[in-house]
């Protein structure tokens, strides 16, 4: 089995019991809801990645944020007929302030590299099967429980 590492920065954009999630396309989380964010590029800090990815995926300019968690999960998936195990490592930030109206920016359902767009979801209405492993872990760390 091929073993890979993925290092990323992700945003927790909350409004009461609602959280912004993206609908993933491709990869081990295909069809799942995931936190907006992505890969830390060569030379980038985790914070620079956070700002870039949230502008790309959600359409917001991050103004104020705080580190919430650093965590990892292992995900195994079938990639082109070969099993791959990915050690998914992330920095997770609570977004406290941003520019642009998130609702108008995420209403566009355009397909980019790895998502079908983003929107607010009521956390209490989500099922754990809908979520990526890493999103589930972080939402539970916020104090929410799933059956």
Report residues per predicted region:
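A short, polar/proline- and glycine-enriched secondary-structure boundary/capping micro-motif
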Residues: 31-35, 116-117
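Short, solvent-exposed loop/turn segments at secondary-structure junctions
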Residues: 3, 29-30, 73-77
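N-terminal first-folded block
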Residues: 12, 18-21, 25-33
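Conserved N-terminal beta-strand and adjoining loop/helix that marks the start
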Residues: 1-20, 89-94
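A beta-strand edge to alpha-helix "cap/lid" segment located at domain peripheries
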Residues: 1-4, 112, 131-136
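Unchanged
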Residues: 40-63, 74-131
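Charged phosphate-binding loop/patch that engages nucleotide di/tri-phosphates or the phosphate backbone
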Residues: 129-147
């Amino acid at each position: 089995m091929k073993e890979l590492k993925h290092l990323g920065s992700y945003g927790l954009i909350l409004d009461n019991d609602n959280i912004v999630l993206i609908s993933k396309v491709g990869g081990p989380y295909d069809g799942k809801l995931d936190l907006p964010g992505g890969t830390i590029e060569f030379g980038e800090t985790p914070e620079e990645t956070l700002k870039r990815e949230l502008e790309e995926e959600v359409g917001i300019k991050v103004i104020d944020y705080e580190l919430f968690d650093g965590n990892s999960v292992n995900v195994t998936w079938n990639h082109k007929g070969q099993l791959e195990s990915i050690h998914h490592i992330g920095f997770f930030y609570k977004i406290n302030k941003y520019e642009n109206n998130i609702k108008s920016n995420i209403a566009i359902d355009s397909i980019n590299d790895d998502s079908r767009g983003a929107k607010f979801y009521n956390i209490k209405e989500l099922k754990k099967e809908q979520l990526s492993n890493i999103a589930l872990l972080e939402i539970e760390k916020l104090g929410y429980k799933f059956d």
